[in-house]
């Protein structure tokens, strides 16, 4: 008996003088969980087992006394007993070794088969108490009727295939379990088919031989015969497999009808002899194999018994699967083991972690620590911007502050009182260089007289004498006299040292600079690099501050050292000033003059080109909608413009029809190059500023573009109808950018408008026309066309399509033109409304077809008289463009050798390969520019291919070969590309808004990062007792909060000291192994690598969980 009041199985078997297996068999019949002879059961369960075994022994005694009660039945059974014995003797040769444990009493079962089975009395106790003898006789008669061989014998291949011998025996075990079941339905249903004079199991296949497998032990059959004998109706269905079915023993077929579904073992022909009744009794075989006889009269209402509940193959799904596909599985293999695994998305794919916790990245460019150190350095050196008062007016008090900076001749001028001789003074002057560091610490009473006697040199050096005296502790009255004369002497000082003069001038210059210091809103970086001094001048800071900032970032620099663009951006960001590249600025500058000398005689007035610019969501497209009386903004993805839209609007001004060409540019920060191209070809820039938002970063960028293009600016203050709108505040912010309104005395036209309500739209257009009249815009329509490519894309039906803005001349269908390195012949032209044109004049935007490839947006085009001359120009440009493109690709992939090798050694060098396809060239530029801004310290983004057009099968093949992701922007997939992508498992993503595209790419880059391991606290326990077990020890603990889990991480603290960190290997409660113990309970804790427990120790339990890392700092 255990300490908790339970009884072991072997103790119970010893008390009952039985074998352990007999007690285990009884426990299993009673659904009492007992795995082995050492399992513990409660007293109530032990009493239940004892009662069951006593009842079983009584039944066997009663059955033996009734052996000779019915000679008629006995004579019938004798006829079938001999074949059974022969059968068993044949089977004994195939017995498995493990059958020996249960083969003690098989012989009595064969003998009891000769006993009469007809009496119904034993059935009442285990199966149903309500059955009468009349019902049982009816059952017997009904079961005896079907005498003929089963017509369903050819359907044997569709029957259930047992998995192994043990599973066949398990079917009989289930019958033994059902013998003690109180369900009446299991006994009453089989007689129902007798109404139609049909066999009880017409749908089941009836084997021609006994169903016992060849490996079934014979002794277990004898062991349980006494119990089977008292239940003849439940265990008799196997009798029906032979032709001798007239025997009155047929009532035993009541509950074992499912056994008729079991087929012969594959590969062995069925035996056609008379299978007797004696082999139907199930051996008491405890096994975990599935019970497959769940069909027949118990379909739908049967529940598997507790002994086989934990086996996954004991479910109805398992039986149905075997019926549909009679595939013999391996023993113990659960059905459905091979599950289809959905392929994970490539964009969210993570590499397997190679270590528990990756090292944290070292961020060199973090701006916070350098700023803190810079501030502390400013305090030490006294160079803070506020320290300008002691600089402008140097006073006599400044001289004593620097006694160390003395001229070489200042030392010997300190004369002692005994030096009255002029000759001694002269000798002292001659020896001054050798005795420069001579101690002159005695100041006598005759200093005043000496000062009056000496002239020139002594007067000039008096200030340094006084500074030395003031640097010492207070002196007698003579020092005070000297101090009083010091003021007079310093006022009379005629000249200062070179070092003092330089310092004074530097301090004055710094003070003056700090007095008028204003940080610029934005700095423009030229294409070449900047030196430290040039950057300091642009940022209006000292060069020492930039050197200091670079030093804290691990970069040693001098004032003449050149800095690359990334370093300049980092430093400028630290000082709060955005950086604009000069190449973007140059893109906005008008490079070519469209008018030639020959055009001056044929010039006419042309429509002005107006570019609408401004920050994102400030209402540019809505303003154009109000002008064109169209609804463009509502149809755009995300409500933002992502292309340059070119429109021509006809207005009535001063009773004349006037045309205006509008270019709508994107306001998103990614479309800087598009805005620059729009400014390059424009005549007037309309700057849209929201009255409720004010001047924003893209507003400043648009202003710089317009100034680079040298075009006039008209400001439209939009959204004046919204709450919180303040046009005056917008004018104030624009005045800080040197855009002063006319009503404030400036030259910039500012018009408050409301695009939604249409307020002041006519006034804005009138102002635009007035400004363009001053510009005197002219062009020559009688010449070959010249202009600029505004946008370009690849259409799957039309091929390469370019949006052209003709700036001079007339473009006609059939013209041969060269746009950068691309050759084209105009096959067709359409305007913004889709109307086909034969020719287009100056300032007219058209879409042209007929290019051999997609031209680059921003390139200038020119029409040539013949194709030969055009090809010559294009060939030279193509070679230059190839070299430039190759240089850009190499620069984008450039990684420092040291960082690359270090990352490769640590396995941290990760790459995300992308194939980018978009609708137009401008979108490609914008996305590539945005990808350059993503952090690339740990994950590199490699763009293998970027081109406008739809996704083709070639792109899919390239992605499959390189493991890349195809990213499409406002594009579609060609025919066959989708099928190829599915076949090669290539991830193809399509986006309509650039926000979402960049966000997903950043998430994919983060997915390649190894996750961080973070501690998650579980609970705490206090050690209250220690139990020694051999060489180790177990701590008896009380859970104070949370819980402790087995195999979790623990930290043992003794006071403030941590004495152990490791795994919790053993966790028990009341000598039972448990998975976890909650707060308020006691438990035993054991660690394999720690045994030095002490009372009062605190055990902290925690576990390590993974946390997704981000690219940000």
UniProtKB/Swiss-Prot annotation:
Functional description taken from the UniProt entry: One of the essential components for the initiation of protein synthesis. Protects formylmethionyl-tRNA from spontaneous hydrolysis and promotes its binding to the 30S ribosomal subunits. Also involved in the hydrolysis of GTP during the formation of the 70S ribosomal complex.
GO molecular function: GTP binding; GTPase activity; translation initiation factor activity
Protein known as: Translation initiation factor IF-2
SUPFAM superfamilies: Initiation factor IF2/eIF5b, domain 3 (SSF52156), P-loop containing nucleoside triphosphate hydrolases (SSF52540), Translation proteins (SSF50447)
Region (G5): 754-756
Positions in coiled-coil regions: none
Region (Disordered): 56-446, 470-504
Compositionally biased tracts (Low complexity): 248-265
Region annotation G3: where it falls in the sequence: 664-667
Compartment list: Cytoplasm
Chain intervals for the UniProt region annotation (G4): 718-721
Chain residues that bind GTP: 614-621, 664-668, 718-721
Domain of life the protein comes from: Bacteria
Primary gene name: infB
Compositionally biased residues, Basic residues: 474-483, 490-504
Signal peptide span: none
Chain spans, region G2: 639-643
Annotated keywords: Cytoplasm, GTP-binding, Initiation factor, Nucleotide-binding, Protein biosynthesis
Lineage, uppermost ranks: Bacteria, Bacillati, Cyanobacteriota, Cyanophyceae, Synechococcales
Sequence similarity: Belongs to the TRAFAC class translation factor GTPase superfamily. Classic translation factor GTPase family. IF-2 subfamily.
Domain tr-type G: 605-777
A Pfam family recorded for this sequence: EF-G_D2
Basic and acidic residues compositional bias, start-end: 415-429
Key word GTP-binding present: yes
Region (G1): 614-621
């Amino acid at each position: 008996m255990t300490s908790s009041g339970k009884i072991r199985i072997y103790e119970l078997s010893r008390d009952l003088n039985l074998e352990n297996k007999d007690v285990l068999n009884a426990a299993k019949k009673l659904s009492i969980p007992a795995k082995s002879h050492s399992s513990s059961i409660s007293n109530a369960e032990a009493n239940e087992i004892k009662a069951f075994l006593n009842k079983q022994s009584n039944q066997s005694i009663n059955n033996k006394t009734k052996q000779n009660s019915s000679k008629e039945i006995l004579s019938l059974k004798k006829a079938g007993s001999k074949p059974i014995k022969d059968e068993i003797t044949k089977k004994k040769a195939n017995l498995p070794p493990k059958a020996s444990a249960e083969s003690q009493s098989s012989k009595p079962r064969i003998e009891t088969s000769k006993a009469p089975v007809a009496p119904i009395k034993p059935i009442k106790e285990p199966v149903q108490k309500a059955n009468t003898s009349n019902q049982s006789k009816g059952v017997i008669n009904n079961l005896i009727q079907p005498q003929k061989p089963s017509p369903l014998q050819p359907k044997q291949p569709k029957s259930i295939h047992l998995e192994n011998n043990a599973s066949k025996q398990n079917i009989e075990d289930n019958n033994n379990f059902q013998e003690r079941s109180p369900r009446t339905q299991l006994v009453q249903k089989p007689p129902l088919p007798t109404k139609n004079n049909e066999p009880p199991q017409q749908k089941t296949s009836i084997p021609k031989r006994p169903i016992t497998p060849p490996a079934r032990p014979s002794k277990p059959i004898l062991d349980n015969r006494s119990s089977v004998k008292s239940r003849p109706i439940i265990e008799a269905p196997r009798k029906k497999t032979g032709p001798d079915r007239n025997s009155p023993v047929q009532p035993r077929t009541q509950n074992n009808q499912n056994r008729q579904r079991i087929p012969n073992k594959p590969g062995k022909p069925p035996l056609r002899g008379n299978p007797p009744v004696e082999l139907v009794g199930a051996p008491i075989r405890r096994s975990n194999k599935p019970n497959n006889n769940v069909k027949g009269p118990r379909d739908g209402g049967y529940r598997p018994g507790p002994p086989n509940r934990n086996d996954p193959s004991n479910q109805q799904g398992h039986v149905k699967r075997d019926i549909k596909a009679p595939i013999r599985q391996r023993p113990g293999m659960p059905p459905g083991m091979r599950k289809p695994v959905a392929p994970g998305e490539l964009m969210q794919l993570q590499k397997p972690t190679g270590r528990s916790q990756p090292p944290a990245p070292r961020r060199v460019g973090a701006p916070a620590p350098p700023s803190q150190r810079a501030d502390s350095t400013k305090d030490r050196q006294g160079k803070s911007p506020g320290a300008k008062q002691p600089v402008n007016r140097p006073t006599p008090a400044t001289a004593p502050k620097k006694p160390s900076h003395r001229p070489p001749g200042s030392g010997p001028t300190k004369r002692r009182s005994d030096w009255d001789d002029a000759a001694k003074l002269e000798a002292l002057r001659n020896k001054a260089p050798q005795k420069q560091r001579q101690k002159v610490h005695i100041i006598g009473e005759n200093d005043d007289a000496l000062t009056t006697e000496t002239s020139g040199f002594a007067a000039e050096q008096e200030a340094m004498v006084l500074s030395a005296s003031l640097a010492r502790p207070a002196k007698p009255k003579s020092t005070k006299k000297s101090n009083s004369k010091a003021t007079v002497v310093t006022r009379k000082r005629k000249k200062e040292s070179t070092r003092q003069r330089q310092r004074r001038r530097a301090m004055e210059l710094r003070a003056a600079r700090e007095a008028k210091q204003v940080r610029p809103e934005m700095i423009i970086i030229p294409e070449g690099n900047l030196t430290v001094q040039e950057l300091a001048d642009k940022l209006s800071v000292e060069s020492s501050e930039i050197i200091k900032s670079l030093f804290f970032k691990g970069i040693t620099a001098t004032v003449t050292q050149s800095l690359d663009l990334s370093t300049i951006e980092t430093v400028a960001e630290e000082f709060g000033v955005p950086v604009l590249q000069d190449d973007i600025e140059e893109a906005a500058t008008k490079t070519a003059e469209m008018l030639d000398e020959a055009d001056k005689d044929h010039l006419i007035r042309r429509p002005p080109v107006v570019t609408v610019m401004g920050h994102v969501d400030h209402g540019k497209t809505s303003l154009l909608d109000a002008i064109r009386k169209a609804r463009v903004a509502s149809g755009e993805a995300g409500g933002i413009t992502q292309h340059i839209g070119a429109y021509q609007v006809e207005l009535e001004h001063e009773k004349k029809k006037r045309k205006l060409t509008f270019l709508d540019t994107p306001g998103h920060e990614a479309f800087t190059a598009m805005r620059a191209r729009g400014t390059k070809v424009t005549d007037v820039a309309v700057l849209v500023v929201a009255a409720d938002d004010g001047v924003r970063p893209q507003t400043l960028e648009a202003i710089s573009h317009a100034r680079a293009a040298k075009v006039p600016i008209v400001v439209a203050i939009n959204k004046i109808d919204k709450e919180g709108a303040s046009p005056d505040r917008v004018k104030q912010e624009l005045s800080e950018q040197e855009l002063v309104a006319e009503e404030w005395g400036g030259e910039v036209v500012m018009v408050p408008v409301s695009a939604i309500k249409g307020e002041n739209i006519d006034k804005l257009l009138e102002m635009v026309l007035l400004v363009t009249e001053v510009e005197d815009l002219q062009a020559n329509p009688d010449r070959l066309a010249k202009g600029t490519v505004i946008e370009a894309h690849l259409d799957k039906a039309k091929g390469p399509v370019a949006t052209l803005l003709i700036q001079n001349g007339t473009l006609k269908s059939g013209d041969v033109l060269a746009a950068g390195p691309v050759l084209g012949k105009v096959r067709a032209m359409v305007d913004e409304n889709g109307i086909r044109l034969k020719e287009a004049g100056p300032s007219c935007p058209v879409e042209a077809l007929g290019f051999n490839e997609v031209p680059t947006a921003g390139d200038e085009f020119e029409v040539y008289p013949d194709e030969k001359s055009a090809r010559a120009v294009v060939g030279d440009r193509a070679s230059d463009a190839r070299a430039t493109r190759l240089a850009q690709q190499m620069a984008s992939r450039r990684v420092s050798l040291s960082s690359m090798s270090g990352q490769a050694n640590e396995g941290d060098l990760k790459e995300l390969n992308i194939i980018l396809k978009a609708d137009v060239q401008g979108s490609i530029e914008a996305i590539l520019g945005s990808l350059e801004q993503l952090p690339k310290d740990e994950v590199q983004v490699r763009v293998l291919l970027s081109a406008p057009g739809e996704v083709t099968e070639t792109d899919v093949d390239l992605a499959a070969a390189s493991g890349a992701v195809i990213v499409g922007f406002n594009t579609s997939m060609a025919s066959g590309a989708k099928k190829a992508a599915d076949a090669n498992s290539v991830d193809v993503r399509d986006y309509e808004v650039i926000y979402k595209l960049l966000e997903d790419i950043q998430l994919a880059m983060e997915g390649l990062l190894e996750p961080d391991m973070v501690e998650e606290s579980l609970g705490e326990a206090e050690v209250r007792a220690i139990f020694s077990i051999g060489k180790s020890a177990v701590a008896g603990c009380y859970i104070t909060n949370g819980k402790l889990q087995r195999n979790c991480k623990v930290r043992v603290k003794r006071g403030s000291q941590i004495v152990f960190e490791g795994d919790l290997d053993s966790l028990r409660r009341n000598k039972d192994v448990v998975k976890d113990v909650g707060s308020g309970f006691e438990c035993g804790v054991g660690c394999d690598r720690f045994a030095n427990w002490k009372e009062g120790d605190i055990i902290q339990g925690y576990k390590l969980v993974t946390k997704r890392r981000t690219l940000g700092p």
